[in-house]
From Swiss-Prot:
PANTHER family: GLUTAMYL-TRNA(GLN) AMIDOTRANSFERASE SUBUNIT A (PTHR11895:SF151), TRANSAMIDASE (PTHR11895)
Taxonomic source organism: Helicobacter acinonychis (strain Sheeba)
Catalytic activity: L-glutamyl-tRNA(Gln) + L-glutamine + ATP + H2O = L-glutaminyl-tRNA(Gln) + L-glutamate + ADP + phosphate + H(+)
Family: Belongs to the amidase family. GatA subfamily.
Record-level Gene Ontology MF annotations: ATP binding; glutaminyl-tRNA synthase (glutamine-hydrolyzing) activity
Taxonomic lineage of the native organism: Bacteria, Pseudomonadati, Campylobacterota, Epsilonproteobacteria, Campylobacterales
Coiled coil segments of this chain: none
Single Gene Ontology BP annotation: translation
InterPro entries: Amidase, Amidase_CS, Amidase_dom, AS_sf, GatA
Subunit structure of this chain's protein: Heterotrimer of A, B and C subunits.
NCBIfam families the UniProt entry points to: gatA (TIGR00132)
Enzyme Commission designation: 6.3.5.7
Protein name according to UniProt: Glutamyl-tRNA(Gln) amidotransferase subunit A
Keyword annotations of the record: ATP-binding, Ligase, Nucleotide-binding, Protein biosynthesis
Active-site residues, record numbering mapped to chain: 53, 128, 152
Amino acid sequence: MITLKQALSLSQDELETLKNGIDANVRASDLNAYIKAPSLNGASAKGVPILIKDNISVKGWEITCSSKILEGYVAPYHASVIENLHQNSMAGFGLSNMDEFAMGSTTESSCYGITKNPRDKNRVPGGSSGGSAAAVAGGLAVAALGSDTGGSIRQPASYCGCVGLKPTYGRVSRYGLIAYCSSFDQIGPITQNVEDASILFDAISGHDSKDSTSANLKPTQTFKNLNRERRFKIAVLRDHIKDASNEVQLAYENTLKALKEIGHEIVEKKILDSHYQISIYYIISMAEASSNLARFDGVRYGRRAQNIKDLKELYLKSRSEGFGDEVKRRIMLGNFVLSSGYYDAYYLKAQQMRLMIKEQYNKIFEEVDLIFTPVAPTTAPLFNYHASPLEMYLSDIYTIGANLSGLPALSLPVAKDPLGLPIGMQFIAKAFDEQSLLDVSYALEQELKLKLD
């Protein structure tokens, strides 16, 4: 597939040819990365085609978050990131499959069916932005937008072998993103390489008055300023990687060796055990999800239950029929931790621990420029591999820290396991220092000269 950098130099006629080719390939593919062929979404805006995750509003398109409860909902406005794309010679072209309401790590909970990993179709692509990552890795998209709440851009990028960037919280507008966990959610790019990630990030970043959490900063110019000659002081968290598989640990050590050879300084640091971070993350995210998803009641928009007797039954049947099992589980747990008897014991304590984690990251960044960790403890698992929801939640063990602290993080493919499955590694940077993330990743990408195709 042509890169985003290359596509931006195409004429309008060449872009139309590109779009027609993508549309035909999507129709012929069995990955199920797209909800439906792009042309069926009425994708007519001019510009380089960018795949959009099905929780980002595009005016006139049916946006469902891959859930039955939003069946028939047509977005009445553009998300701010879509308007930003239009201002930078890009446009939405197709909607990607995802875990329902972005709640999952495998893209198995979508009402549209599973998405397959293009590297091995018997394996998951990761989630929740699995459709976006599978399409980019499978040659079905020039680039894509995803959303990252606890690793939902970085983990599928790692499983599929592409680049995924979660920007600093507030760097990219969330206006028009259908919320899962408002204090964690962030839109970001999934691309074929670091240069493309930089280009797409620059296009969507910047202050937005329509988003009260948007940082009052100008759009970035990271692509223009990409510099592979910079050298950094990078922290490793040795205690943090003990749960990774042997293949991931080997890739981690080999990548550290490459970083040292480039000239970066490596130091060891410690942070709160990642298992505690998992508990904190899920308490807060489920609490916010239970609040955010209360609006889907079958009255105002989306699916409405039939043959109902009263308002209570309308609410009950619409939500019971519309939500999948994982979403119901998180709503119930979220309501539980917010209930009067348990609010202080769970939710309040989790918020206090979240602040402590943020302070720990800030303390580390007083002495270093970047933190280096794996993205996931394993390579992409087989479908139905996770024996329980808890086992699935643990696949986010290395990614949630950046969401808890609001920091930017990038997933970069660095190796393959003996089965040929991609392995990604993650850099975390100081708040609003995406430039350093992209610079170190660009230099490492060029050094490794890794080709996963």
